[in-house]
Amino acid sequence: MARRTKEDAAVTRELLLDAAEREFCERGASRTSLAEVASAAGVTRGAVYWHFRDKSDLFSAMCARAKLPLQTMLERAGNTPQDDPLETLRELMTTALVRLATDRRSQAVFEVLFHKCELTGELAPIAQRRQAERSLCLAHVERLLQQAIDAGQLPPDSDTSLATHALHAFMSGLMREWVLEKNAYDLAAVAPALVEMTVTGLRNDPPRRPGRVRPRVRPRSCTAT
């Protein structure tokens, strides 16, 4: 009996998360009440509070369900020595884009995150959590870039912080724009080429830390004939 109750609770929790995705995506997170989420899930408002403290807790759980697999992969890559760090980075970036392009749950969550979420009022606590998640993501990527330096794939004076922020801007910007206009191009098909372009640029000419002057290429002197 206890096992059945636990299973029922897990099912109810998933129903609430599914309903939150739909309602937040349709109405916007700040304009959707917990009562509306409960109604869409076919449960009582009390069931919402059994599983989640408030709207921000529900919102966080919805996001975590969609992003957790990729976050786990990134954390493992950053904290584990890689034979080919830049190849690992390329694979992670490509996987993230392909997942977004092919997984409706990811699309719904990122559409809410990017375009239908005002982090004020009930959702104000989300801003701090998102900043913490972003900082953790950047830290894992920077560790991966440091591994690339240690492996001789990037120069010792590469500015890993600047490169990390540039990669994050590329990924978040691309995902934000594609979610806004999904029919513009086939993201799953072009993801490998887009990522390869970015990683190749990083490999060939990474940003350098200031204070170390790179040698200038002088033009050859012309001699009269």
Which residue ranges define each predicted feature?
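Amphipathic alpha-helical segments enriched in hydrophobic/aromatic and basic residues
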Residues: 24, 33-34, 45, 55, ...
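Short secondary-structure transition hinges
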Residues: 94, 98-143, 153
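Amphipathic alpha-helical packing segments from all-alpha helical-bundle domains
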Residues: 68-71, 75, 83, 87, ...
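Hydrophobic alpha-helical connector segments
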Residues: 61, 75-108, 160, 164-167, ...
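C-terminal peripheral helix-coil segments that are non-catalytic and often amphipathic
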Residues: 91-99, 135-151, 165-225
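Basic, helix-initiating cap at the start of DNA-binding domains
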Residues: 1-27, 31-43, 57-60
